[in-house]
């Protein structure tokens, strides 16, 4: 058995692509438009031949999707948690759970999907402004 992807329904495709590609740094692997089914599938990953997330955009969706408590979050390992969070914050992304411990942070996608960011290797030394930054909202 081989893990392939996780599917996320998105309400605003352009906002979702801006977030996942321009802000989070994923790349588009492939795309499929179905005129008959009236949907678009876009597969994103950290690199070629890596597991993907599938963004599903239903063309006729009128209301934003809601998420239940059965789905938790996506998680990505990053080379430098502080640099990643700073870049995201500079691009308008709210850091819901700052990396106070130098290891873990949480953000949310435009469709309210929680995303965990984990420092590669050992935690970095606690550093300001992150060490004293409060949580914002939930994650």
Spans of model-derived segments:
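N-terminal beta-strand motif that seeds the catalytic metal site of vicinal oxygen chelate
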Residues: 1-17, 71-76, 121-139
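Core segments of cupin and vicinal oxygen chelate
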Residues: 7-50
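Vicinal oxygen chelate
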Residues: 29-32, 82-139
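Short, charged/polar surface micro-motifs in flexible loops or helix N-caps
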Residues: 47-51, 60-62, 77-81
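Short, structured motif recognition centered on aromatic/hydrophobic residues
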Residues: 53-55, 71, 115-117
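Acetyl-CoA-dependent GNAT
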Residues: 57-61, 119-122
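A contiguous binding-surface segment within folded domains or other stable secondary-structure elements
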Residues: 60, 64-73, 93
